[in-house]
Amino acid sequence: MFKWLMSSLCGTKNPASLEEVYEPIMGGKNPATMLRLQSALAAVNALLPATLTIEDVISSADNTRRLVKAQTLARTYQACQHNIECLSRHRASSDNPNLNAVVATHMANAKRLSDTCLAALMHLYLSVGAVDATTDTMVDHAIRMTAENSVVMADVAVLEKTLGLEPQPSVMAHDLLALESSVYNSGNSVPVNDYPAEDVESTQSVHSPLLSKRPSNTEVVCSSIPVKSNLKSKPRRKPSLVAA
């Protein structure tokens, strides 16, 4: 009696009582239990691409545990949606800049938490295995549902990581590097005509690695450009004067 009184005052409970207890519902259908299951399915199915049935859930104890976790995630997701909707009504002003920063921080945290809950729901939904659907369909439906709820997905990678997907970029890394290098070379290459040739006896070769490759006709044009020099050429004598 004294031990129970002290545990009640201190707020501690027996570790054995903290274990999860699930009611057996396969043997008979208790109306109160079935009502709770239907309420949980209604909360979870609102966020899933295809609805689950009670038969899918009560087929095994693991599915029942998944439903309990999914119900908690669904309620958390709905709470985040409500908070995001309320925070989006805030209009930033210069009167209270500290409030603007707090609202922005709460908005980002709510979006990230909602995305995480949605990703976990998709993972639990796929683990049930009662619906014939592919992982790509799940991701597409999840993104579409989030877009329809006017929620910007702050971290789409959470879905990919949770579902075990690897992003497939449209452009490979080495292709992107080659494209950037070609753009850099074309932007930094300077034509030979732009170099000052006042005191230069010969022009720079067009095959220099510092310059981009040019067509053959351009090389011919560049080679025919006269080179200026500081040496003044002597005037030629007329043939008549030389003959005289």
Swiss-Prot record:
Pfam families in alphabetical order: Herpes_UL51
Annotated lipid attachment (S-palmitoyl cysteine): 10
InterPro entries associated with the record: Herpes_UL51
An annotated GO cellular component: host cell Golgi apparatus
Principal location class: virion
Domain of life of the source: Viruses
Post-translational modification: Phosphorylated. Palmitoylation is necessary for Golgi localization.
Protein localization: Virion tegument; Host cytoplasm; Host Golgi apparatus
Keywords associated with the record: Host cytoplasm, Host Golgi apparatus, Lipoprotein, Palmitate, Phosphoprotein, Virion, Virion tegument
Keyword field contains Lipoprotein: yes
Record family assignment: Belongs to the herpesviridae UL51 family.
Function in brief: Plays several roles during the time course of infection, including egress of virus particles from the perinuclear space and secondary envelopment of cytoplasmic capsids that bud into specific trans-Golgi network (TGN)-derived membranes.
Subunit structure: Oligomerizes. Interacts with ORF55; this interaction mediates ORF55 incorporation to virions.
Protein name per the record: Tegument protein UL51 homolog
Organism: Equine herpesvirus 4 (strain 1942)
UniProt lineage: Viruses, Duplodnaviria, Heunggongvirae, Peploviricota, Herviviricetes
